[in-house]
Amino acid sequence: MGFRRLSFPTDFIFLFPNHICLPALSKPYQRREISSWLARWFPKDPAKPVVAQKTPIRLELVAGKTYRWCVCGRSKNQPFCDGSHFFQRTGLSPLKFKAQETRTVALCTCKATQRPPYCDGTHKSEQVQKAEVGSPL
């Protein structure tokens, strides 16, 4: 009677699928990667954000209020999320932020900003100006 030597950790997963906490892999990102069989067999890269508009939207944010800025660019309620990312299966999710003080700000709608959710002037670049509204950069 002989035992087959396991080539750890992949054989361990198939022999004992209910054990997701492997001692050799104690970091959370590794545990999630191993336990998610769906992601392993059906990988899905997130879609690229699309240009919603080529100019920012200026509005007043109220202190203490939480906002959800649309990252995917598909929302009909720009610059805020309306859940379109979920129904179109983009793999993206909104950026949740809380206003620290009441003030007027420019929120990005080209989705190319380096300081989300705030506009940094990237919409003036040639790449954004050449892109069509509704197309990815």
From Swiss-Prot:
The gene is Cisd3. This is CDGSH iron-sulfur domain-containing protein 3, mitochondrial. Coiled coil: none annotated. InterPro entries: CISD, FeS-contain_CDGSH-typ, MitoNEET_CISD. GO terms for biological process: protein maturation. Its cofactor is [2Fe-2S] cluster. [2Fe-2S] cluster 1 binds at C70, C72, C81, H85. The modification N6-succinyllysine is found at K65, K124. Disulfide bonds: none annotated. Belongs to the CISD protein family. PANTHER family: CDGSH IRON SULFUR DOMAIN PROTEIN HOMOLOG, CDGSH IRON-SULFUR DOMAIN-CONTAINING PROTEIN 3, MITOCHONDRIAL. [2Fe-2S] cluster 2 binds at C108, C110, C119, H123. Pfam families: zf-CDGSH. One of its GO terms (molecular function) is metal ion binding. Gene3D superfamilies: CDGSH iron-sulfur domain, mitoNEET-type. It comes from the Eukaryota. Its main location: mitochondrion. It is found in: Mitochondrion. Monomer. It comes from Mus musculus (Mouse). GO terms for cellular component: mitochondrion. The modification N6-acetyllysine is found at K65, K96, K124.
